[in-house]
A protein has these predicted regions:
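Short beta-strand scaffold segments in enzyme catalytic cores
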Residues: 35, 83-87, 222-226
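Conserved N-terminal subdomain of the carbohydrate kinase-like
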Residues: 43-123, 303-307
Length: 307
């Protein structure tokens, strides 16, 4: 069974619960993906830094309780754990980052594990914002490819955290160029390709990288994949959303769980089935508040697919 390493930020999400209260929820896209993968029965390890503080210990204990490997999760005594206030309006979300730079931005090469052949590394763009995390992330990508593994990238753009839009595009596109698997939202893809329509953005990215598995998520409508000149829309199941915070991360968890356990994932019938399950994982995650708490188990996913 191939292991999935997830590199990046582990975040404490503060989610409104009534007028004067916030729920403290474990979050951060990479941490969510690691937990999501583990709940689906696949081996997962987290690579990243949190503060040596109550919130950092809370994150480490949370991941450990979910059977995610935390040997590469460093408690940094000099930095603070990333904390985000999540705003919800009709189920859609907004983010206010309370700690910048946070501990995750201080990841060092010495924090990286020894990668093995056929393992997967997944990351998001927050890991690329500042040094030393940026250089460490690119070194992790180099090492996993050298070991005979795969790199998956979900930009998950947070423009407000970057010094400039130009720097964000330049650095994120460097990671895009190195990925075997890419997951974009429509807005992210048009921004990164300097286009204004999904059609133009898709044409640009597939012409540049025909050999990569490129997936564009379309919310309740499912996802479109492109690979080696082939493309297909894989429809999703619509559910009434309570909170969309973890939907993208749940999709990625389902996707990685499927890809990592299949040696012939580039075959159309296999890929369609993997993406169908990823769509279902994303849909299920919208039915509860909080990103991590809503991630489905393997049993929940199988039951939903059977309905």
């Amino acid at each position: 069974m191939s292991k999935i390493w997830v590199l990046g930020d582990a975040v404490v999400d503060l989610i409104p619960d009534g007028e004067n209260h916030y729920l403290k929820c474990a979050g951060g896209a990479p941490a969510n993906v690691a937990v999501g993968v583990s709940r689906l029965g696949v081996s997962a390890g987290f690579i990243g830094r949190v503060g040596h503080d109550p919130l950092g210990k809370f994150m480490q204990q949370t991941l450990k309780a979910e059977n995610v490997g935390v040997e590469q999760m460093i408690l940094d005594p000099k930095q603070r754990t990333s904390t985000v206030i999540v705003g919800l309006d009709d189920g859609e979300r907004s983010f206010t980052f309370m700690v910048n730079p946070s501990a995750d931005q201080f990841l060092e090469v010495a924090d990286l594990p020894q990668f093995q052949a056929d393992e997967w590394l997944h990351s998001c763009s927050i890991a690329l914002i500042n040094e030393p995390s940026r250089s460490t992330t690119f070194e992790a990508i180099r090492r996993i490819k050298q070991a005979g593994g795969f790199f998956s990238f979900d930009p998950n753009l947070r423009e407000s955290l970057w010094k400039s839009l130009d720097e964000m595009k330049q650095v994120v596109n460097q990671a895009v160029a190195l990925a075997d698997v890419l997951k974009f939202s429509e807005e992210e893809l048009t921004l990164l390709t300097d286009t204004t329509t999904l059609e133009a953005a898709t044409a640009a990215i597939t012409a540049q990288y025909p050999e990569k598995l490129i997936i564009i998520t379309l919310g309740k409508d499912g996802a479109i994949y492109h690979l080696n000149g082939e493309s297909k829309l894989v429809a999703g199941k619509a559910l009434k959303p309570v909170d969309t915070t973890g939907a993208g991360d749940a999709f990625v968890s389902g996707l990685l769980a499927g890809l990592s356990q299949s040696s012939d994932w580039k075959k159309e019938s296999v890929l369609v089935d993997i993406i169908r399950k990823a769509n279902a994982s994303g849909a299920l995650a919208t039915t509860q508040k909080g990103a991590m708490s809503a991630l489905p188990s393997k049993a929940q996913l199988e039951q939903f697919l059977a309905e």
